[in-house]
Amino acid sequence: MLLTFDIGNTNIVIGIFENNKLIKKWRLPSNTKKSADDYAVDIIELCLTERIDCLKISGAIIGSVVPTLTGLICESIKKFTSETFTGKILVIGQDNVDLNIDLKVKNKNEVGHDRIINSIAGFKKFGGNLIIIDFGTATTFDVVGKSGEYLGGVIAPGINL
């Protein structure tokens, strides 16, 4: 099983994939005051509620816009997975993960990993020539060209700002 995290400013969305299929998804509030132990307990409780065996987790992928939480989540994964855990914890943007997308913008470092991942997912699901709108803490509009290239985007205040 693969454990995934989308760590945002407001929420952490956790997914469990088995055989490339999403089998469960949860949402926790983002809280930098919690410890890695706290997050480990939260995730264990969520898995137990759904009868998911944490020891069967073989890898994890983290996409994050909150660096402090990224470290906490990495620590928490190590606390509740098996000592024989041989999978890798990949952090998008930190582990030289090739996202295989052409960023057609002046400053590539200004495009958040969340927006790049949204663009890749949109292209995989719908093909090119897309505008992707993400209503998160901020509302983002991102444009994907016909060949899957990222053409740019805009960040606006979110609905609660």
Model-derived regions, located:
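Short, well-ordered alpha-helices that flank and scaffold nucleotide-derived cofactor binding pockets
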Residues: 18, 45, 75, 79, ...
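A general structural signal for short secondary-structure boundary/capping elements
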Residues: 50, 110-113, 135-137
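Short, flexible micro-motifs
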Residues: 11, 115, 139, 151, ...
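Gly/Thr-rich phosphate-binding beta-strand-loop-beta motif of the actin/hexokinase/Hsp70
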Residues: 1-25, 122, 128-150
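N-terminal phosphate-binding loop and adjacent alpha-helix
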Residues: 23-72, 160
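Conserved phosphate-binding catalytic cores of ATP/NTP-utilizing and phosphoryl-transfer enzymes
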Residues: 97-130
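Short beta-strand-loop/turn "lid" adjacent to the catalytic site in phosphate-handling enzymes
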Residues: 52-110, 147-151, 156-159
